[in-house]
């Protein structure tokens, strides 16, 4: 989709679909202006529709004998309450209303005079991401026509076009994450993730190292390797690196959970455990892949970024890990596996040890780790655990700017006793109460003291059955925009 600015007013703009954000009571008189332009009794028509300018209101009116094919009105709520999140939702609603139409979408929203560039970029991202559809696995794809050009109307500075250049790389990263999460487990395997990394490295000049099973054995990654004992698929430990053109003053590491399918192992997922949806247990790896895709094109200065994904399947056969087995992680920590369905933290443990050896300035891991986080925060907010206030604030600000829900949770150290094992250094799960906290405390054991680290549990946010906001139903690509914001912010400090 081509994105540009247009100096035209809504009274003069011509294109396929004209979409206007309308606050309650229409203080700017846009409805009256459209009545005059299109010779419509628009006010009378709106009285018959559920449209009063409230958030969520959206109506589309086909236009005959006009240089536009449709007029879309999107409610914004009280004018004084319009913020960037509301602009995103309005832009996404306008995009969906324009679906089925080709050509150009003209969009007018009340851009902030203080942050017009950020508002415009957020709206442009919302339009592109809301129009996303996945037809890869249909025998007869039925793609709906959609606008191929977006023109942003209103009082936007002419130099703002440069700021919109980041929209396409960021959206491409989100779309990559969505594709990886949505694809079935017979399509996205550990080997396929490795091929995806190879493609990114080749296309964008990134460095790539892939550790095979024997390489992981040499490094003592017994925690990671225990998870894949029952799978015929070979594990892949993927290390992708972005290096800036200039000297790097910061080194950041992104770690993503990469379980391409999780049966639960001998603690088999049954009942409401959604075994049929466990293709999305690699949502953390999808997020960091998407972030690297965007960063590779944006090329922020002064920051070096490493992506680590310990990818495998958790399956059952005669060689699969047993409940009660004791394994040794690459830092020498022994772990009693009291639940084979708490496997993600076992893969992340060795990835975090590897990350620390890179001597980073910060580590952030993302994982679909616990159902407890979903119970606590629902499906629109991810949980954040960190003992570093500065890193937590950076990530919260990055998520807020991205419009992605993120809430800091307590890393309550007294709960560490719940991981105590009679035989090993620790168990891989604690009591059911506070399960997402003990999961984070488990991961903390594999991060060197003094290295800022944050864990983001995206179990609820990685998928949306019905769609919400910018996200169609299915994979959301959550986390990509937050990570990109965080990295680019670090590049600027």
Curated annotation (Swiss-Prot):
One of its GO terms (biological process) is proteolysis. Mn(2+) 2 binds at residues 257, 262, 281, 343. Keywords: Aminopeptidase, Cytoplasm, Hydrolase, Manganese, Metal-binding, Protease. Binds 2 manganese ions per subunit. Its main location: cytoplasm. Pfam families: Peptidase_M17, Peptidase_M17_N. Mn(2+) 1 binds at residues 262, 341, 343. The keyword Cytoplasm applies. Its cofactor is Mn(2+). It catalyses: Release of an N-terminal amino acid, Xaa-|-Yaa-, in which Xaa is preferably Leu, but may be other amino acids including Pro although not Arg or Lys, and Yaa may be Pro. Amino acid amides and methyl esters are also readily hydrolyzed, but rates on arylamides are exceedingly low; Release of an N-terminal amino acid, preferentially leucine, but not glutamic or aspartic acids. CDD domains: Peptidase_M17. Presumably involved in the processing and regular turnover of intracellular proteins. Catalyzes the removal of unsubstituted N-terminal amino acids from various peptides. This is Probable cytosol aminopeptidase. The gene is pepA.
């Amino acid at each position: 989709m081509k994105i540009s600015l247009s100096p035209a007013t809504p009274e003069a703009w011509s294109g396929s679909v004209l979409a206007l954000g309308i606050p309650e009571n229409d203080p700017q008189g846009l409805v009256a202006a459209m009545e005059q332009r299109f010779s419509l009794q628009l006010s009378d028509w709106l009285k018959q529709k559920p449209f009063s300018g409230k958030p969520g209101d959206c109506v589309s009116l086909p236009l005959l004998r006009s240089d536009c094919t449709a007029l879309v009105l999107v409610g914004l709520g009280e004018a004084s309450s319009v913020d960037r999140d509301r602009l995103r939702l309005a832009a996404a609603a306008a995009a969906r209303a324009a679906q089925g139409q080709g050509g150009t979408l003209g969009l007018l929203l009340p851009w902030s005079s203080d942050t017009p560039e950020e508002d415009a970029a957020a709206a442009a991202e919302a339009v592109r991401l809301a129009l996303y559809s996945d037809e890869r696995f249909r025998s007869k794809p039925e793609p709906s026509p959609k606008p191929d050009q977006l023109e942003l109307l209103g009082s936007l500075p002419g130099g703002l076009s440069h700021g919109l250049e980041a929209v396409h790389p960021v959206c491409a990263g989100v779309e990559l994450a969505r594709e990886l999460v949505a694809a079935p487990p017979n399509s996205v395997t550990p080997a396929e993730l490795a091929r995806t990394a190879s493609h990114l490295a080749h296309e964008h000049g990134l460095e790539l190292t892939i550790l095979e099973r024997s390489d992981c054995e040499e490094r003592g990654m017994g925690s990671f390797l225990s998870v894949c004992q029952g799978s015929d698929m070979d594990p892949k430990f993927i290390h992708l690196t972005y290096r800036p053109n200039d000297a790097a003053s910061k080194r950041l590491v992104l770690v993503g959970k990469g379980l391409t399918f999780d049966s639960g192992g001998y603690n088999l997922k049954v009942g409401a455990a959604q075994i049929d949806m466990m293709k999305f247990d690699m949502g953390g790896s999808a997020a960091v892949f998407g972030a690297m895709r965007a960063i590779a094109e944006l090329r922020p200065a002064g920051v070096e970024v490493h992506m680590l994904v310990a990818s495998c399947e958790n399956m059952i056969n005669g060689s699969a890990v047993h409940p009660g087995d004791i394994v040794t992680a690459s830092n020498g920590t022994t772990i009693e596996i009291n639940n084979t369905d708490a496997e993600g933290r076992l893969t992340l443990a060795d990835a975090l040890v590897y990350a620390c050896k890179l001597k980073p300035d910060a580590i952030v891991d993302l994982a679909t780790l616990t159902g407890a986080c979903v119970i606590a925060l629902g499906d629109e907010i991810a949980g954040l655990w960190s003992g570093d206030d500065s890193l937590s604030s950076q990530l919260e600000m990055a998520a807020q700017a991205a419009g992605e829900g993120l809430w800091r949770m307590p890393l309550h150290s007294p709960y560490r006793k719940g991981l105590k094992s009679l035989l090993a250094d620790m168990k891989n799960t604690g009591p059911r109460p506070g399960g997402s906290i003990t999961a984070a405390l488990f991961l903390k054991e594999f991060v060197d003291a003094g290295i800022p680290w944050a864990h983001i549990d995206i179990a609820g946010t990685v998928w949306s059955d019905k769609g919400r906001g910018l996200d169609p139903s299915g994979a959301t690509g959550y986390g990509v925009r937050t990570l990109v914001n965080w990295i680019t912010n670090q590049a600027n400090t």
